[in-house]
Amino acid sequence: MAGAFLLLWVLSAAGCAQGGGGADPAATVLVFKHGKLSGDGAVVSELLREFEQRRPGVLVREELLPASSDRQHQYYAMNLDGGKAPFDLLAVDTIWVQEFAKAGWVAPLDDLLPQAERDEFFPGPIMAATFDHKLYAVPWYVDAGVLYYRRDLLDRHGIAPPATWPELVHAARVILDAEQDAELAGFVWQGKQYEGLICAALEVIRSHGTDLWTGDRGRAETGLQFLRDTISVHGITPLSTSMADEESTRRLFGDGRALFMRNWPYAWSLLERAGSPVRGKIGMAPLPSFAGHAAAPVLGGWLLAVPQHSPRREAARELIRFLTSPDAQRRIAVAIGYNPARRALYAEKSLLDIRPVLKDLYPIFLAARPRPVTPYYLMLSQSAQPEVSALVVGRKTARETLEAVRRHAERLAIDEGAPFVEAPL
């Protein structure tokens, strides 16, 4: 029954289309698949119509997939694996490019983006888009983990945004003890058993100079233990964190019920919109680190790629150049708050006047590190998720968790042969 439902969803996905109606039968029709964007995605449709005007004889049909990245990945894998995907351009998560390239599902784009132009983008997305020394996708917009904080409450108690994890714990405890508000949490983060949990764990562990799958075991255990201690020792993180994702933590923080939150930049515009209980009361900062080490935000974001066997590859490549141009990225940043992948835009006064938060995000994106750059990343992550989840709920110690995570990785290495490359510390 589940398989039948999935098949029906895959077959019906093509019906969620925008544009291209009443197409000239002689025109080249490009099908562009991407996930539903938050906010008003009309700006993308407007850009596609503009591309059609610039490229007579080409029409673009925009077909939306669910916002869930898991469901998007499932759809792409099912359709690309057969070599006859019903689309010509696709938006891919940073963690998929290696897998899709190794499988031969997407075409190399080296000549589309020469090295000199690649340097105009943040380095993390370019690293994630490169497999076997070839570029397979072009960065569309970028994300990284950030720390949100209640600026009003920190100011009231004379506390600066924390630069280290111990400082965050201290700040949260001081304010919680002073406020005596039973509904106020100190620090919320994504602890549900899913990819967001691995991102949160990586950011803490890497900010101690090591990594989850490789590197110094003692420092990695300390990082894992810190996550558990925010719940069980320091009492600054709710027990419900074991079920928390990005949206549930955003709602909690947005309702004024948390001091600190780890999340992605998308939350900023939602927290600052009219009617928000915390509008004008929040700040954004780099994630903390352990003393003597740098913050280590996990890279997120999406890139554009072309199916290997698309008969309309040249037109699709032109569309990639158009959608990743400075003008297109600028307009998307203004309209829906998605962050440009091109670095120079963060120095444009006209854009900063509209979105001043970009000034704070620039150094964070510059420091953002991809998750392990490997075609097997999803297997690595999926094997680690239940182990780290067991730590969050107290069923495993930090040592037991790390041993299990690395044991799974070693087995994968044996089965697949040196399956992953860590992003440089």
Predicted features and spans:
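Extracytoplasmic/periplasmic substrate-recognition and gating elements
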Residues: 49, 77, 156-157, 228-237, ...
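Extracytoplasmic/periplasmic solute-binding protein
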Residues: 136-140, 145, 169-214, 258
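Hinge/lid segment of periplasmic solute-binding proteins
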Residues: 93-144, 169, 185-186, 197-200, ...
